[in-house]
Amino acid sequence: MSCQSHNATAPSPAIAPGCGDLDTSAIAAAIGSRGIDSRISTLIPGFDAPFFQAGLAGYSDAAMRLVARRHGCPMCVTEALLDRTLLAGGRGFDKADLGDLHDNVPGGPDDHPLCVQIMGSEPREMAAAAVKLIEQRQRSDREYRLLALTNDEPSSRPIQHLRDPGGRQVGPWPPSDGFSDEERRFAAAMEMTARRPGGTAGFQCIDVNLACPVKKIEKKARGGHWLAEPRGAIAILEAVREAVPKEIPCTVKLRRSFDDTPEMAENFERIFASLSSIGYAWATVHARTVQQKYIGPSRWDFLRDLVRRYPNNIIFGSGDVWSVHEIFRMIHYTGVHAVSVARGCIGNPWIFRQAREMMAGRLPSSPTIAEQRAAMLMHFDISLAVTRRFRHGEEATSRMMRKFGIKFAQHHPKGDEIRKRMIDVSSAEAWRGILDEYYGA
C-alpha cells in the first residue's frame, strides 16, 4: 500500500534555525560514545544505533532492507500493510501470507530486527491483523521463502533444492570451483532469502500507521486521516496494544498534525499524550502535516518542542534527512532518540555505513565505483531470487529496479547518462549491461 504516492518532490531543507552550522563530526562522535538509549536496545535487541530505514511503500522490500543491513542499518520497517488484506487475503496474499505484496515477509534470518507496519480503519480489524502478524512471527520453523523448490521436501539446507533463473540446479553454498561469478552471486542471494529461519523469525514489533498522507488512504479513513479524529485514533491504538502480547513492543507513526489549524494541533496533542498510558514504546513523528504530504520543508523545531514537552517519552524523528549529516543534525537539534531515514536512503545504503563511521570518529566515506556496482548487483540478485517464482519474474524485477538504478546513479560521475539508460531496463541482461559499461565488468 503506497504512502509515498510516487512522490518525486525535490529535497528541501528542514526548518531548523542555525542547524546548518553544527559540527556533525563532533556530534556523531559524542553519540557514538554514549550509544543509543538503553530502553530501545532492551526492547529491540540488535537495534544498536540511533537511525533506521523507514517503511517506504514500493521500495522497502526484503532486497532493499537486506542491502541496507549489509551497510550498517540496525533496524528496518516494512511498508504499511492493510488490516483487511491481512485478514481476508487480498492480492498476493497466497504468495506470501502478508499484505498486498510478498515483499513484506521477513527476508530470512538476516532481515532482523524488523518492525511491521499496519494501517486500517476499524479497531477490531486492526487488532485482529496485529494478532495474525504475531502468529506469523511464532512460526519459527516455517519456510518464508519457498523459492523454486523441486518435488523433494525442504531440507535443513534448502539451497540444495534451488534452481537459478535458467533452471539450472544451484549447488551448496559456497559453490564449488567451476561456478561463474554470476552463479555465485545468485546462489548467495537465494541462500540468504530461502534458508530456514530460527526462533527469531518474524517481526520484532508492531507499528501502527497514523501518518500516511496519500489522498486515497485519507478518504478511506486510514493513516493520516486519524490525526483529524483523535477519538478513533486512540481506539485503534488501544485495540492493537490490548491484542498484542505485552512482550512485543507496539509503536506508532505520526505526522505533526493533520493541518496547521489550532484544532488539529490539539488533536495531535491529545493522541500523543495518550501513548504512554496505553503502552506504546515510542512514536516516530514526521515533521510535516498530512496536508503537506511531501511538499515544503519539515519543521524540526516542532520535534524539538515535542521532545522538551515529553522528556520521558521515546521519540523518533522523520523528515528531510537527505544525507548522513542530517541524521546527526536532527538528533542534536531536536533531541530525538533516533532518526527514521526514508527517501534519503533510496539508492543510498551507504548513508548507514557513513553514520557508523562518523560515530566511530572517522570521516564518512563515499562509495567507490566498485562498491556501487557490488551493492547494485546484490540488490538486483536478491530481488530476482525473491520474485523469480512468479510469472515474468525477471522482467518484473528488472522494471522494478529501474527506480532504484536511477537513485543509485546519483553517486556516479556519469549519473545523468545512467539515469537515461535505466529508464528502459526490462531484463537482467540489460541491467548487467549497464553495470558493465559504467561500473566495470
Explain the meaning of each model-derived region.
Residues 1-47, 52, 57, 63, ...:
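Alpha/beta catalytic cores of nucleotide-metabolism and tRNA/nucleoside-modifying enzymes
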Residues 23-45, 56-147:
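Glycine-rich, positively charged N-terminal anion/phosphate-binding segment
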Residues 74, 81-87, 120-123, 210-224, ...:
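Conserved radical SAM core fold
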Residues 77, 115-117, 207, 251, ...:
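Conserved beta-strand positions in the central sheet of alpha/beta enzyme cores
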Residues 88-92, 218-221, 264, 295-297, ...:
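Short secondary-structure transition/capping segments
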Residues 131-145, 149, 186-206, 210-220, ...:
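Alpha/beta enzyme core
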Residues 141-144, 152, 161-164, 177, ...:
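Intrinsic-disorder-associated, low-complexity terminal segments enriched in Asp/Asn/His/Tyr and depleted
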